[in-house]
Regions:
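Hydrophobic alpha-helical packing residues
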Residues: 85-89, 246, 378
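Conserved RecA-like ASCE P-loop NTPase motor core of nucleic-acid helicases/translocases
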Residues: 29, 33, 234-235, 329
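A conserved structural/catalytic subdomain of Rossmann-like adenosyl-cofactor enzymes
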Residues: 2-3, 268, 272-434
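A generic secondary-structure signal for well-formed alpha-helical elements
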Residues: 39-52, 171, 221, 225, ...
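Non-catalytic, mostly N-terminal accessory regions of nucleic-acid modification and defense proteins
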Residues: 1-199, 258-269, 362-365, 387-398, ...
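Conserved, well-folded catalytic cores of nucleic-acid-processing
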Residues: 18, 148, 166, 170, ...
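Conserved S-adenosyl-L-methionine
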Residues: 178-280, 285-289, 294-302, 313-314, ...
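Soluble or luminal CAZymes and related metallo-dependent hydrolases
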Residues: 7, 11, 238, 311
């Protein structure tokens, strides 16, 4: 990721922000991110279409090639959504200056909803025809987002995710809230997924944000030649808007997941789920999680009810509760969870005594795009192999990073491989018992 790429999001935001004064922030974020989503969906579709045309050019007649290029099932089988003509970006752009462009965009969304009800129903609000923007405003945004160059393959999806993360943080700040960790850095999601050796089974993220862990898991399966249908995806997200973004993120990959909107603290949507893999990046040190609203004898908190002023061990116990007998968990956690005393210290002691922790990696600072708090990667397993019994592997990786800007560090591929080598016993632990 180059420095010039990082300034691109800022330029895009400043350009899009010019119209924000015309519309309420809670509506404008849907307008902007909905358009970017439509833009990317068409981009991915057109790239796949070009690939088909080039491949089939010498084998079939023009009419037959056209028929193949309009085969909906072919695109879905290849991890891309087929986009009907009147929902395509070219059609929207061609009509950008029409007085009814808002209706045209709403109709495009409805077409996609009808085509993919499980993935997209009610995900993008159809508000374009009723907001306080005229055709000139829409033309400005459409032309602006037409300039986004997504690149190729996984890089294209990285750019999409980065733009979404950046805009999510900006819109959250504009609403007077603290910017959240909606998009976990890919260098972290990829490392956790590799260490857990995610393959077939059930993967669960109860604080799924925009779905970054799911994407890294799906990409790992693709690299290893495993069909994505072998991995069942479950996620819960407390913020309605971010829940919608996660649904979009899976949709652009042609994946159906069971993603539900709700508060994991008090409304566990997957109470009976026992997952093979739990991956997560929960809110750090949440001081207003609602301890007084926890029901008596909640089975998740067998090690004790965490304090009101910090939810770190709410999440850790939530993960333990949802693990299958041979399940594995890998998650990002604020460093305070390693040293908190009083109730937290007692809970941590009991978890260690039950031999559930099998590894912790101390990460460098500034790994998150919008949050600078230091963090560690935790790895849990309910059933350790014999050689890991009574042991916890600690890896100090605080100096293992590449600075890509003043405010963000990343793990490079070399750093990831070094971490994987150092944590080989963790990978072995995940491979021995399957």
């Amino acid at each position: 990721m180059k420095e010039k790429d990082l300034t691109f999001e800022d330029k895009l935001w400043k350009a899009a922000d010019k119209l924000r004064k015309k519309v309420e922030v809670h509506e404008y974020k849907y307008i902007v991110l909905g358009l970017i989503f439509l833009r990317y969906l068409s981009f991915a579709f057109e790239e796949k279409r070009k690939e088909i045309e080039e491949r089939e050019a010498k084998q079939f007649s023009e009419s037959l090639r056209f028929s193949i290029c309009e085969d909906r099932d072919f695109y879905i089988a290849n991890g891309t959504l087929y986009v009907p003509e009147k929902a395509r970006w070219d059609y929207i752009k061609k009509n950008a200056n029409q007085p009814n462009i808002g209706e045209i965009i709403d109709q495009a969304i409805e077409i996609l909803e009808n085509e993919y009800p499980k993935q997209l129903k009610d995900v993008i609000p159809k508000i374009y025809s009723r907001v306080n923007l005229d055709s000139h405003d829409f033309a400005y945004l459409i032309n602006l987002f037409s300039q986004i160059h997504f690149g190729k393959d996984h890089h294209a999806k990285d750019i999409f995710g980065r733009i979404y993360e950046y805009f999510l943080g900006k819109f959250t700040e504009a609403e007077g809230k603290k910017g959240g960790e909606f998009y976990t850095p890919r260098s972290l999601t990829k490392l956790i997924v590799e260490i857990l050796d995610v393959k077939e089974g059930r993967i669960f993220d109860p604080a799924c944000g925009s779905g970054g862990f799911f994407i890294s898991a799906l990409e790992k399966l693709q690299r290893e030649g495993i069909e994505k249908e072998h991995l069942s995806i479950y996620g819960q997200e407390s913020k309605e808007f971010v829940w919608k973004v996660c649904k979009m993120n899976l949709a652009i990959r042609g994946v159906e997941g069971d993603i539900r909107w709700g508060d994991s603290y008090h409304d566990d949507k997957f109470f009976d789920l026992r997952a093979d893999y739990i991956v997560s990046n929960p809110p750090f040190n949440d001081s207003e999680w609602g301890r007084d609203r926890i029901k008596p004898n909640d089975p998740r908190f067998k090690y004790g009810l965490p304090p009101e002023n910090n939810a770190n061990y709410v999440w850790i116990q939530h993960y333990i509760y949802h693990l299958a007998p041979n399940g594995k968990a890998g998650f990002v956690m604020a460093n305070g969870a390693l040293s908190g005393g009083s109730i937290e210290g007692e809970i941590r002691k009991k978890i260690i005594e039950d031999d559930l922790v099998y590894g912790i990696i101390a990460t460098p600072p500034k790994m998150f795009y919008t949050v600078s708090l230091p963090a560690s990667l935790w790895f849990l397993r309910k059933s350790k192999p014999k050689y890991m019994k009574g042991k916890i592997l600690f890896i100090y990786a605080k100096k293992m990073f590449k600075a890509i800007s003043r405010r963000q560090n990343v793990f490079t591929e070399e750093h990831k491989q070094r971490s994987l080598k150092n944590s080989e016993c963790l990978k072995m632990a995940s491979q021995k018992k399957r």
